[in-house]
Regions:
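Membrane-anchoring/interfacial helices and their immediately flanking loops
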Residues: 17-20, 24-69
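Lipid-exposed faces of alpha-helical membrane segments in multi-pass integral membrane proteins
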Residues: 48-60, 89-93, 115, 119-125
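Transmembrane alpha-helices and immediately adjacent membrane-cytoplasm interface residues
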Residues: 94-105, 115-142, 148
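Membrane-helix interfacial "entry" motifs
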Residues: 33-46, 71-83, 104-109, 113
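Membrane-embedded alpha-helical segments of integral membrane proteins
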Residues: 55-101
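Short extracytoplasmic/periplasmic juxtamembrane "stem" segments immediately C-terminal to an N-terminal membrane anchor
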Residues: 83, 140-156
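Extracytosolic and intramembrane catalytic regions of membrane-associated proteins
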Residues: 158-286
Length: 286
């Protein structure tokens, strides 16, 4: 999260950039006798503000899309709604306020611009935080279905009980594929059912039952369905799958699929029909 939120601090350089256009140094700006941004029109000031805001938002968006929510998880996990709010506040409203209040040589202009920059920085930091804590951290195979598990779905106490040290902390660079492996003893299974009913937690949110997907690939093939028959039935799923096949050069007969439950509905995970290797994710119908 820190990488994205560092962009927020750059909002405070708006004033410095405006002043630099008229030859005022950052040190000189501490002298209240020097009017800020003399000679700039409000349209120029708003345009500079817009460019800076757009650059900062683009940096935060890049990290969000490439690291925390790799395609197609951004739309599947509802990230687009928050993005709209962030863009509205950080890229649109800030420069509009500058357009309204800016007047070259206006007393108190430096303070006004500082307040706008602070407001935008706070909005960006808050948005980054929300996106960070709601990011998908594991894609869990349980029985014949994958499910996205978000950072705020897991308790620290439950993470600490994971048998594999790799699953005792939340991934920072995108979701990790894992599988749920339950004991075969019926008594233990009944105890797990009783525990989940009492705690209200589902098994996919209990990392102590996680194993690496690599250990589960062969079994995943037996739990999957052939892609070719599904393609022949048509529909949105077939359209998305056909698009992937055309772009990748893969054959439908070489692939199987397993349903993927996301916040916005059911998508699919395509796997190699022989090895069980993950090939790609198909988004749900939105």
């Amino acid at each position: 999260m820190s990488s994205a939120c560092l962009y927020a601090s750059r909002q405070f350089h708006i004033i410095v950039v405006l002043a630099a256009n008229i030859g005022i140094t950052e040190h000189q700006m501490t002298d209240t006798t020097i009017p800020i941004a003399r000679g700039l029109t409000r349209w120029q000031a708003s345009g500079i503000h817009l460019l800076i805001s757009a650059a900062i938002a683009a940096g935060a968006l890049f990290i969000t899309l490439r690291v925390w929510y790799p395609p197609p998880l951004f739309t599947a996990e509802g990230g687009s709604e928050l993005l709209f709010i962030l863009v509205a506040v950080d890229v649109v409203i800030g420069p509009l306020i500058t357009l309204v209040i800016f007047k070259s040589g206006k007393p108190g202009l430096r303070f006004d611009l500082s307040v706008i920059a602070l407001f935008q920085a706070c909005a960006l930091v808050y948005g980054c935080h929300v996106m960070f804590v709601a990011r998908p951290v594991f894609i869990v195979l349980a029985m014949d279905q994958f499910e996205t598990v978000r950072a705020n779905d897991l308790d620290a106490a439950d993470l600490a009980q994971a048998p594999d040290p790799a699953f005792r902390s939340l991934p920072l660079t995108g979701p990790v594929f894992v599988a749920v492996e339950l004991p075969k003893d019926m008594k233990q299974l009944r105890e797990i059912i009783a525990e989940t009913q009492k705690s209200g937690k589902i098994v996919t949110h209990l990392p102590r039952y996680y194993v690496s997907y690599a250990q589960h690939k062969t079994k995943a093939v037996t739990q999957s369905r052939a892609l070719d028959p599904a393609m022949k039935r048509g529909g949105d799923f077939a359209t998305l799958a056909q698009k992937f096949l055309a772009e990748s050069g893969r054959k439908a007969s070489d692939l199987n699929y397993i349903e993927l439950q996301t916040r916005r509905g059911f998508g699919a995970v395509l796997i190699d029909a022989k090895s069980g290797e993950i090939v790609t994710l198909l988004p749900p119908k939105l």
